[in-house]
């Protein structure tokens, strides 16, 4: 995916680096695969703010994405490439030969007209999905399941991927984008190839208004608050706030927050 840097004609254009969206071939979402999405403004059922700095933004329709890839043995053709406001990558609209339509995340290297297949065991071509036990070692994969049949959980955002580094009869070991090495069941599904739009990390909004279009409100710094509101607040004049901490007093730079008693820790080989 290509990005463009705008000329500094105005203040809002000076730092703007945005996507060109040249690849998109269909403007409106498929009606049978999209549903309405109600905005909460970060409030719960009693009207109290539970998620700060969230609200406003453009209306969105939620696209139903096929993360399970459980339509085995039936080939599909990539018919359209679409924008999805709910995620950082683009999505493909698939037409199966039996007439069904489904959305999947876009895969790097695929284009309109390519054929893909899901099965327990199939060829290692880009976009194909199969059990991890049948994927060769060293293969770049994405949309990895943690529980068989539940749908992809890992490596789903723009530019992300995992790598298969070891296999046994029951488990397979994968290296995640964070560098973590983790065991997953061999019967979990995974897609061959990495997620498209690796340039997403280079994008810059350039102005506050673009953040508001996306539904994100201004965030107040902790050091600008009073001591009653934040551990880093208060002090005479401008102060550093001391050791960086979040609103609950937990150190914010490099502090491990994962529960040490979590039962799934035994599947993590290296953090």
Curated annotation (Swiss-Prot):
One of its GO terms (cellular component) is large ribosomal subunit. Keywords: Ribonucleoprotein, Ribosomal protein, RNA-binding, rRNA-binding. Residues 257-271 have a biased composition (Basic residues). GO terms for molecular function: rRNA binding; structural constituent of ribosome; transferase activity. Pfam families: Ribosomal_L2 (PF00181), Ribosomal_L2_C (PF03947). It comes from the Bacteria. One of its GO terms (biological process) is cytoplasmic translation. SMART domains: Ribosomal_L2, Ribosomal_L2_C. Gene3D superfamilies: 2.30.30.30, Nucleic acid-binding proteins, Ribosomal protein L2, domain 3. InterPro entries: NA-bd_OB-fold, Rib_uL2_dom2, Ribosomal_uL2, Ribosomal_uL2_bac/org-type, Ribosomal_uL2_C, Ribosomal_uL2_CS, Ribosomal_uL2_dom3, Ribosomal_uL2_RNA-bd_dom. Residues 221-271 are annotated as: Disordered. The keyword Ribosomal protein applies. PROSITE patterns: RIBOSOMAL_L2. PANTHER family: LARGE RIBOSOMAL SUBUNIT PROTEIN UL2M, RIBOSOMAL PROTEIN L2. Belongs to the universal ribosomal protein uL2 family. Part of the 50S ribosomal subunit. Forms a bridge to the 30S subunit in the 70S ribosome. One of the primary rRNA binding proteins. Required for association of the 30S and 50S subunits to form the 70S ribosome, for tRNA binding and peptide bond formation. It has been suggested to have peptidyltransferase activity; this is somewhat controversial. Makes several contacts with the 16S rRNA in the 70S ribosome. This is Large ribosomal subunit protein uL2. It comes from Karelsulcia muelleri (strain GWSS) (Sulcia muelleri). The lineage of its organism: Bacteria, Pseudomonadati, Bacteroidota, Flavobacteriia, Flavobacteriales. The gene is rplB.
